[in-house]
Amino acid sequence: MSDAPLFGKYRAVVINNIDPLQIGRIQVMVPDVGAVIPTSWAMPCVPTAGINAGFFSVPIIGAGVWVEFERGDPDYPIWVGCYWGSAAEVPVLAHAVPPGVPGITLQTPLKNGLTISDVPGPTGGILMQTTTGAMISVSDVGITISNGKGAIITMTGPTVDVNVGALTVI
């Protein structure tokens, strides 16, 4: 350990996210600690973990992460979360939830995602969407399933509609 303990959070950038142990560790560059030397493997700090249970997500290379050091020792880094460097980095699906409305967005870099929103009506609820446009939407209005290529099933009230009126069951 260096002479002075390193307490607090430090901005860092992911340089390696392929953990040989597959436990969510990453290697980062922490400019305020050692500008050109990558850290040893930074352990993840996750909201929940246990045997065959927990939250697992690893940031992509180049992502901004917050790093702390166990007992202030730079040989024991912990990545405790991530940050966006600009508005352009925020997941596109997050913009479907208006500011001030409770919502949760999970999205991969290729835009496969899940949005849960408290927006009332047809635009709220739960939306799962793939990169190619296939989606499942569950809202107060009903449920819509689309393959992104034209096939659509809509369930509203007691009605099931297939392909915009090609078959309707009441």
Q: What spans do the regions from the language model cover?
A:
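Hydrophobic packing positions characteristic
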Residues: 1-155, 170
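Short, low-complexity, Pro/Ser/Thr/Gly-rich segments in the mature regions of secreted, periplasmic
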Residues: 165-169
